[in-house]
A protein has these predicted regions:
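Soluble catalytic domains of membrane acyltransferases
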Residues: 47-183
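Negatively charged linear elements and acidic catalytic determinants
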Residues: 7-56
Length: 183
């Protein structure tokens, strides 16, 4: 699996940075794996992040915007990518008092997915919605209760609209736009 990952990572890096030299490619790949390992290791401390014991390790920019969303009781669609520890975003939104549901794609590893679901529901965001038709009913129900939604938009999708991404046609999710239009 790691060999396959390396091929995909190198191909993607060369698509994004066609002039990258081998040294920079290897360095960037090492940094990527380093970040991936840190995020994985931070799950051990996710309870401490939730309980406020590690707040000095987190920097929030734009808290005043979140405070305004809460004050106005607005429903918002939060979009992000898998940057640093992406789980902390949903955790902070929920801890701030925003009624939040998070859309997720189940992990390929069924056993690990069950563990991650429990961790996410207990410490990150109580309302976890599985991506796809199965979670749609739950999402609609929560949206009608004025819940905001958090989702990562940097994953491969099987449906959407075709758009140019690094000069290649790629399916692009329309979920954020659909949520804003409908709710």
């Amino acid at each position: 699996p790691l060999f396959r990952s390396k091929i995909i990572i190198n191909a993607n890096m060369r698509t994004a940075f066609p002039n990258i030299n081998s040294n920079d490619l290897n360095k960037t790949t090492r940094l990527m794996w380093n970040n991936y390992g840190r995020v994985f290791a931070e799950y051990v401390f996710i309870k401490d992040f939730r309980n406020g014991k590690l707040t000095s390790n987190i920097q929030i920019d734009g808290q005043e915007i979140l405070d305004e969303i809460i004050k106005q009781n607005n429903q918002v669609v939060f979009i992000s990518g898998h940057l640093s520890n992406f789980e902390l975003m949903a955790m902070h939104l929920e801890k701030s008092g925003i009624k939040l549901c998070a859309i997720y794609r189940p992990l390929n590893n069924v056993f690990l997915n069950n563990i991650m679901e429990r961790i996410r529901k207990k410490y990150i965001c109580q309302y976890q919605i599985e991506k796809g038709l199965g979670g749609l009913r739950k999402l609609i129900s929560l949206k009608k209760q004025n819940f905001s939604t958090a989702l990562m938009i940097d994953q491969r999708v099987s449906e959407g609209i075709l758009s140019k991404f690094f000069n290649t046609e790629a399916l692009t999710t329309t979920i954020p736009a659909q949520l804003v239009k409908k709710f």
